Amino acid sequence: LAFFNTGRSVMFLICAICEICGSSSSFQNWTYCFTVCRFVLTQPTHLAILIHLFLTGFVLCIVFVESARGMKQKKPWAGRFSKQTAASVESFTESISFDWRLYQYDIEGSIAHAMMLARCKLITDAEKNAMVKGLKEILSEIHAGKFEFKKSLEDVHMNIESALIERIGDAGKKLHTARSRNDQVSLDLRLWTRDQTQIMTRNLSALQKELVTKAKRHLGVIMPGFTHLQHAQPVLLSHYLLAYVEMLARDRSRLQDCFVRLNKSPLGACALAGTTLLTDPLFTAKYLNFDGVCENSMDAVSDRDFCIEYAFCLSMIAMHLSRLCEEWIIWCNDEVKFIEISDAYCTGSSIMPQKKNPDVLELIRGKTGRVFGHLTSLLVLLKGLPLSYNRDMQEDKVAILDAAETVHASVSILSEVVANTSFYAERMLAASGKGFIDATALAEYLVKKGVPFRMAHEIVGNIVRECIKVHCKLVDLQLEGFKAFSSVIEKDVYEVLGVENCIKNYKSYGSTSPGLVKKRITYWEKKLNKG
């Protein structure tokens, strides 16, 4: 009974502590448990004594486990602080909700860092092996969806480091030797961006191939070329499609340039000034396939130029996609109807049964503004930051990660749309016969006859005005009608008029000449098949 009374006193003491700490959700749950315990303890039976002893031991175990867990999740910078971080601050400052996507690169960088530490005798080989094994196990767990990322640990770096320490003990605490989260996050971002440039290049290549395939299949199809959305000159549909292939080629070139500038390792810069420990940044750079090491430690941790440059590349890509989408949205219209997009890539209306909407194209066009916004966000984010690292930089990942995901999705889905779109060649040809689209060919005919171009331009303008008045095309005007405006016009004028003759007579390099377009298709087929 004495033991029982003593135990009961201890139990009530624990209850009191739990109620005082009731603001904590875990302690609050315990309070409910102890309310039940109080009731049991008021019953003077031997069963109550047994229940009391069991629950006392159980609660003490929980207290021990929770205390140990709290110690493991202690902030890495907690030594300077006398109070725990407010829950609101943890929620506001965490980045794990978005930077978890960098886990593979964080682990890759940590393995390289561990290898370097062992090479420089800053840790033992046994410690290195334990680190590498533990990091690979964590990577496997994340891939399998079994790893729990915790907001209380702020970011991807501390989540992985904490998990490593939990696995291998004190050896894990040595991983951060000669490293700061400042150079660590810069490394992660560089590794991620480096991979992204290569993935995006491949995706663009796939889109180019679809466009070239369509160009080859529709070689000979004539369509109106537009300026100011007005009929201008006839062109080949293939020539039009290859224009976007050229745009995407420049996008790929920009990505390659971006790769060259970002492919430097920041490891070794630490917080901003380097380290007094003897390390080997060249080793980690080579291990991670970088071309070299950042030459200035302050620049290494504060540089986000590569993020801005990549965001600019993404913006250019999105802009090119949006231009194509804008045109094809117009071409889907029943008044134009140059193309038919597969039902699988369109949607309908909730109220109008007949509707078939090009929503995919519209969304790509709409998402382009979002990508532009991320580029602007990065520029504004960095414009006022003093050297070196500032917490503002945490927001760079929000912008660049979303911009990349958006453009990757847009490029991929547009490749599918292109592959599943049909062209109405007859409607395109019919539209090409409107709007005096062969007028420039007539002006150049006069130039060949010795008429100065400005005079030829005026003569043809007068002829067009006359044709509008009498409701006829240029090719339908009688020879006498032409001669009324210029005596140099002969019967051979009809060899340059009409859209087919216009297309046949193009000669300049890079023009819509059928022979040149065919050669360009062959060029792109070979180039894209090489990768």
Where in this protein do the model-derived segments appear?
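Alpha-helix capping and helix-loop boundary segments enriched in small/acidic/polar residues
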Residues: H176, R181-Q184, H228, A232-V235, ...
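Short, well-ordered beta-strand elements within core beta-sheets of diverse protein domains
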Residues: H113-I123, H239, E246, I308-M316, ...
